[in-house]
């Protein structure tokens, strides 16, 4: 008896291990962003803070994009991995400026992060290396799916790096 997941996403088995990891990571990322968007927007409405509502809407859009990318990748579509690159691009940088009169912060968290920040006087600039890794993995899986889809023989898939041929 097949499970609901196997019936809905039969092509999932064709994904390489890095593709499966990226699909689940992006799915969790989308869920986290949608939940945070709802909380942020409700809090902004209660406290009458327009920027909180705007940031909640931005997070909601990013969450829907992440869920769309995961859905398409579960369905073994290359467009899912292409969208994953757009999902993780806003997570690359962290910029914080604290001045006498005002402060500015740009930072969108990803589910997994490994960041390095440099602070000079009142300015902090950070890079999330995990987001760079996720973008690279999404790009590799996108190229892999494009190669598989361009292959004329549907039963033969290109070998992943490190796989051996069976004789």
Where are these regions (language model features)?
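Topology signature of small-to-medium multi-pass alpha-helical membrane proteins
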Residues: 1-167
């Amino acid at each position: 008896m097949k499970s609901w997941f196997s019936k809905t996403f039969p092509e999932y088995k064709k994904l390489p291990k890095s593709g499966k990891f990226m699909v689940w990571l992006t799915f969790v990322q989308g869920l986290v962003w949608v939940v945070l968007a709802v909380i942020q927007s409700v809090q902004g409405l209660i406290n009458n803070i327009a920027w909180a509502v705007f940031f909640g809407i931005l997070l909601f859009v990013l969450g829907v994009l992440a869920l769309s990318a995961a859905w398409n990748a579960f369905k073994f579509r290359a467009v899912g991995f292409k969208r994953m690159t757009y999902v993780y691009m806003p997570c690359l940088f962290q910029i914080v400026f604290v001045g006498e009169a005002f402060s500015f912060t740009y930072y969108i968290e990803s589910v997994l992060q490994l960041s390095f920040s440099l602070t000079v006087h009142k300015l902090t600039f950070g890079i999330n290396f995990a987001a760079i890794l996720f973008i690279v993995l999404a790009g590799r899986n996108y190229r892999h799916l494009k190669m598989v889809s361009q292959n004329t023989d549907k039963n033969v898939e290109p070998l992943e790096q490190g796989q051996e041929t069976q004789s």
